[in-house]
Amino acid sequence: MVQIINKESNDRSKKPDVEYKVRELFDLDVAMTVPGFSKKDEYVPIIDDSYIFDKETTLSILAGFKYNRRVMIQGYHGTGKSTHIEQVAARLNWRCIRVNLDSHVSRIDLIGKDAIVIEKGVQITKFKEGIIPWSLLNGTALVFDEYDAG
């Protein structure tokens, strides 16, 4: 099941507000800047200072952030694909949410649903967005983990 997102937790811009130099942030010999955020929040992964970046994979992930493109990383189970994305996001202060695409995730979790809510003392039906629309609206990197799972 996908965890319900606290929609009120929004004390930062929804769009990147700084440019980071890849050479300085990742110690890679490239003249490239990547958009990021000046502030962290609860959805920004924690930085692992001991993490070792693979240059080609890192540049692919950074290109995705820079050009707002999807990036697919594939490899054997347990080789650190999702962690690599999270560690890049952590250094850019990008929100990053990992969604395990196992049998417990439904279309409703991903897209959203109509829900009965109380507003101003009146019961109404209101659309509650799932993880995909929420992420699109809130500047969040989504990692679909185990997309090929049964």
What spans do the regions from the language model cover?
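AAA+ P-loop NTPase catalytic core and its hallmark functional loops
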Residues: 1-150
